[in-house]
Amino acid sequence: YAPSALVLTVGKGVSAATVTPERAVTLTCAPGPSGTHPAADSACADLAAVGGDLDALTRSEGVMCPMIYDPVLLTVDGVWQGERVSYERVFSNECEMNAHGSSVLAF
């Protein structure tokens, strides 16, 4: 099997160079779901459904978030099915981040 192991972090701000991570979790999906992610089973299933493409994780319908700009930066680093992953995305606030990615970003 090709390894799939990721470290996800979130912190307030817009640049990985200046953001201090406030939370971090590990997520291992191969050979089986594990790690410190609170929903490893469903997060791995959600990632597998989009082939590990974090940009393909869609926003949950019906979630209402305040229109307040308080940016948070998500970083994801590691390997997915043996391929190196280094990903950053800024969300306008934490509610917007939680509304994306179903269980993957819920940590």
Curated annotation (Swiss-Prot):
GO terms for molecular function: serine-type endopeptidase inhibitor activity. The record marks 67-68 as: Reactive bond. It comes from the Bacteria. It holds the Pfam family SSI. InterPro entries: Prot_inh_I16_SSI, Prot_inh_SSI_I16_CS, Subtilisin_inhibitor, Subtilisin_inhibitor-like_sf. Homodimer. Strong inhibitory activity toward subtilisin. One of its GO terms (cellular component) is extracellular region. HAMAP family: SSI. This is Alkaline protease inhibitor 2C'. Disulfide bonds join 29-44, 65-95. Its main location: secreted. Belongs to the protease inhibitor I16 (SSI) family. It is found in: Secreted. It comes from Streptomyces griseoincarnatus. Keywords: Disulfide bond, Protease inhibitor, Secreted, Serine protease inhibitor.
